[in-house]
Amino acid sequence: MDSDPRFAAAAGGAVRFLAEAAGMPEDVCKEFQEATVRASTKAFDAQPRQPHTVEFLVFGDRLEVAIDADVGSHAIRLSRSVVPQR
């Protein structure tokens, strides 16, 4: 992804969709979305001229997001446990 705030918002929307589909509570979905947008924006601001890779990883017990500019720095990783609604 290019360092565009619209891509940060899109990454947040994708995480929210995955979190809702996994049955996570609404407040957790919203927080994960906001955290993803913040992390994406932070990564974009740190390396504005570099393309970024955003990975969405779905496991049975958690969802993860990794944002990486692939310039030797460590990726920003976010993870939330899947807590199904009852």
What are these regions (language model features)?
Residues M1-P25:
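Helix-loop-beta hinge of the Bergerat
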Residues P5-F7, K30, P84:
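A generic structural micro-environment signature
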Residues K42-R86:
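Conserved beta-strand-loop-beta-strand hairpin that lines the nucleotide-binding pocket
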